[in-house]
């Protein structure tokens, strides 16, 4: 049996999650993995261990082809290269357009010439209640990797 396409994999996982009435936060509790990481797995941007894939398969009632596909090494960052049109995703694009260079400068002033890893990395999303309207708090924590001189 051929491996499901990334879009089929995502659609199958989302349908199974919806059918079980689960949120990513529910899956975090059940699997012991962060909800953002689990969501990245659903979108084909992460790889599950055999144990993680089996646990998710049992929880969601996944078929063997989907379970096997979760264990494959994905092509990361394989989103459409055009400017995103989804309003929420576009805001992150807009944030990088406005604050990308300032953020780069501040990071390099504090750490030197290098980058923030997206491999040795965590991403957390929290809800901050505010009487003027709830706020979204996104925390990125990546290892600093200095550029090597040779």
Swiss-Prot record:
Q: Which GO terms describe its biological process?
A: cyanate metabolic process
Any idea which residues are catalytic in this one?
Answer: 91, 94, 117
Q: What keywords does the record list, in alphabetical order? A: Lyase
Q: Name one Pfam family in it.
A: Cyanate_lyase
Q: Which reaction does it catalyse?
A: cyanate + hydrogencarbonate + 3 H(+) = NH4(+) + 2 CO2
The UniProt function text for this chain reads: Catalyzes the reaction of cyanate with bicarbonate to produce ammonia and carbon dioxide.
HAMAP family xref list: Cyanate_hydrat
Q: Which family does it belong to?
A: Belongs to the cyanase family.
Quote the protein name from its UniProt record: Cyanate hydratase
Biological source species: Synechococcus sp. (strain CC9311)
């Amino acid at each position: 049996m051929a491996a499901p396409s990334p879009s089929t994999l995502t659609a199958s996982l989302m349908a199974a999650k919806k059918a079980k009435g689960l949120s990513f936060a529910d899956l975090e509790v059940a699997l012991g993995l962060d909800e953002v990481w689990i969501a990245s797995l659903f979108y084909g941007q992460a790889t599950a261990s055999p144990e993680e894939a089996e646990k998710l398969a049992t929880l969601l009632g996944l078929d063997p082809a989907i379970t096997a596909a979760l264990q494959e090494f994905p092509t990361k960052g394989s989103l459409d290269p055009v400017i995103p049109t989804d309003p929420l995703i576009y805001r992150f694009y807009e944030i990088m357009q406005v604050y990308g260079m300032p953020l780069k400068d501040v990071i390099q002033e504090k750490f030197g010439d290098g980058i923030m890893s997206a491999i040795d990395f965590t991403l957390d999303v929290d809800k901050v209640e505010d009487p003027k309207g709830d706020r979204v708090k996104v925390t990125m924590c990546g290892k600093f990797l200095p550029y090597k001189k040779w």
